[in-house]
């Protein structure tokens, strides 16, 4: 079933692939941040993008409309990530106290990346984009 975005018709699979690519792009940006003073806002921005797109995939994308069984597994991993990890409060606390502390900023970024890598979630997302 096609989905219409800004007068452009895309298939449901293309829509999912586009969302997964947004997640992977933000994940790559998180990987490449150099942990300088002030980077906490960049980390927060990318983390919020990732969480938003993961929430869309978990809540809005129907598994019956995606032809590959790998999607169901990834959707479960996304749901578990949303249930088990939340960095918003820590980032808000850090922003006012430690936003220029490079080691704390780096540690926060690494914890977010570790959570995203858990159970090979990002690898599975990357593989699914190739297979769709």
Residue ranges of model-derived segments:
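Long, low-complexity or tandemly repetitive, helically biased scaffold regions used
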Residues: 2-132
């Amino acid at each position: 079933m096609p989905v219409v975005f800004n007068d452009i018709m895309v298939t449901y699979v293309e829509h999912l692939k586009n969302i997964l690519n947004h997640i992977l792009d933000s994940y790559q940006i998180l990987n490449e941040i150099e942990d300088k003073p002030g980077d906490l806002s960049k980390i927060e921005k990318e983390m919020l993008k990732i969480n938003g797109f993961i929430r869309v995939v978990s809540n809005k994308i129907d598994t019956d409309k995606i032809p590959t069984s790998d999607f169901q597994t990834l959707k479960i991993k996304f749901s578990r990530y949303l249930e088990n990890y939340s960095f918003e409060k820590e980032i808000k606390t850090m922003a006012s106290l430690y936003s220029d502390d490079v080691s704390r900023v780096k540690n926060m970024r690494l914890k977010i990346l570790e959570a995203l890598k858990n159970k090979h979630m990002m690898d599975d997302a990357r593989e699914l984009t190739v297979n769709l």
